[in-house]
A protein has these predicted regions:
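Bacterial N-terminal signal peptides that target proteins for export
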Residues: 1-8
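Intrinsically disordered, low-complexity regions enriched in serine, threonine, proline
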Residues: 3, 19-20
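Bacterial N-terminal signal peptides
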Residues: 8-16
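Periplasmic polypeptide-binding modules associated with outer-membrane biogenesis and secretion
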Residues: 21-445
Length: 445
């Protein structure tokens, strides 16, 4: 069964089947062997071998086969979605029939990776081997159109059933939220509870393991899933290294090791409830110390003013997490001066021989924006007039992105008493006039 996540897929499969047939000659000898398939030649594809295509076609060398069988084989290959065109021809003689399949591979842009979310009983290599024996054309990439994703799902279900493992295989099509472009197909086992008992970090030192275990404490008892573990590794675990100068640390795909159940536990929990030890491998890499920080591109604000905001002392482990926080402070400073589109990009220059890193902080200041129109909504006439009178940032003055918050903090006494307010501030940038219109909206709770 296929569930679609944020992506509507219109399956449209176009391929042609052209036939060039040379009929067998007359005579008894030819009638005996003419339909025996003795050879298959595959041309046009750069992704698949003759053996893989033959296995996927459903044909077998040595079987009796005729034109109808070849049409079905081409249809089967075309329906997979892996070929944009499929053409066949054959010739027959007294020795048998020779078939040629001319294929055109589907463009790589129409293929997406397949991921296996929670098949904790298998390694990736074991799954790939099991799949390729059942779906010969499977090579980690799947077409966005065609039936191959379904064939893979059916094969995975067959593997589970054969090994007497619980669960039902399903898959999700993942797409980018901004464009609905399909990015991956994610297979997972449903109708089984797989909970994390503990988390291991092969590759980490004992000191690092202690820090990682603390950072990953929310995983204990959580549902096992590779996507969620990858998110935790990126958001919670990687900063453990980045804070300490391990700027090239990387986490690999997670695996799960099934915790053996006693007979009593298995009877109590049932086969559809499992515990696993999650395994998240890490490669820490070198620890880098800061050798220097250099500002580039800043002119509206002097280097002497922004330098104290950066806490990257030379000779100390480079704290990339702190650097991002510091750059956010610099960004806020620029916005308080009216530079609303400022961009600051750190460029790390590594010296692996010395285990040091030098940062160039590249500033694109953008244009100076000025105060535009002020709109206050949701208040009665008198309260609105009081608030507008208290607003001192006038049209045409350099905009200060800090001002709206400070204004609201200082003018609470001007609002009607006895009312709790939800207050939202919306800034609208006019790129042509280089102005900022401010809307402050009040809503009674």
């Amino acid at each position: 069964m296929n569930r679609v996540a944020r992506f509507a897929l219109c399956l449209s499969l176009l391929f042609s089947a052209a036939v060039a047939q040379k009929h067998p000659g007359s005579g008894k000898a030819s009638s005996v062997n003419a339909y025996k398939l003795i050879a298959v030649k595959v041309t046009g594809t750069e992704r698949y071998t003759d053996k893989e295509v033959l296995a996927a076609s459903g044909l077998q060398i040595g079987q009796d086969a005729a034109d109808g069988d070849f049409k079905e084989a081409v249809q089967r290959l075309g329906n997979s979605g892996l070929f944009s065109n499929a053409v066949y021809s054959y010739s027959s003689s007294s020795a048998g029939t020779k078939l040629e399949l001319q294929l055109a591979d589907t463009d790589k842009s129409k293929l997406v990776p397949a991921y296996f979310e929670n098949f904790v009983w298998f390694t990736d290599d074991e799954l790939r081997t099991a799949l390729q024996s059942r779906v010969p054309l499977f090579k980690q990439l799947l077409p966005i159109a065609g039936n191959l994703p379904d064939r893979v799902s059916e094969a995975l279900q067959a593997v589970l059933t054969e090994r007497q493992f619980p669960g039902r295989v399903d898959y999700l099509r993942h797409a980018e939220e901004s464009s609905d472009t399909l990015t991956a197909i994610d297979y997972r086992v449903e109708e089984v509870s797989i909970r994390i008992r503990s988390v291991e970090f092969p590759g980490a030192s004992p000191e690092q393991t202690a820090l990682l275990t603390t950072a990953a404490r929310q995983l204990t008892g959580a549902e096992y899933g590779r996507a969620s573990l990858a998110a935790v590794a990126r958001l919670d675990l990687l900063p453990v290294y980045l804070q300490r100068g391990y700027l090239k640390a990387a986490f690999g795909p997670a695996d799960g090791r099934v915790v053996p159940q006693s007979s009593a536990a298995a009877d109590a929990q049932g086969p559809a409830e499992l515990q696993v030890d999650a395994i998240i491998p890490v490669t820490p890499g070198k620890m880098y110390s800061t050798s220097g920080v250099h500002w580039k591109g800043n002119s509206a604000i002097a280097t002497a003013e922004v330098t104290p905001l950066i806490h990257m002392p030379a000779g100390q482990p480079a704290d990339a997490v702190r650097l991002l926080r510091d750059l956010d402070s610099v960004d806020k400073l620029y916005r308080s001066r009216g530079y609303m589109t400022v961009r600051i990009k750190p460029d790390a220059q590594f010296d692996d021989g010395k285990s040091t890193v030098h940062y160039d902080l590249n500033v694109v200041e953008g244009d100076l924006y000025k105060m535009g129109e002020l709109e206050i909504a949701g208040l009665d006439t008198q309260a609105r007039a009081r608030m507008q009178g208290a607003w001192t940032l006038r049209e045409g003055q350099p905009y200060n992105a800090d001002y709206p918050k400070r204004f609201l903090d200082d003018t609470g006494q001007l609002l009607p008493r006895g009312v709790r307010w939800d207050i939202s501030v919306h800034e609208s940038l006019d790129a042509k006039d280089k102005t900022v219109d401010v809307e402050i909206r009040f809503k009674q709770q």
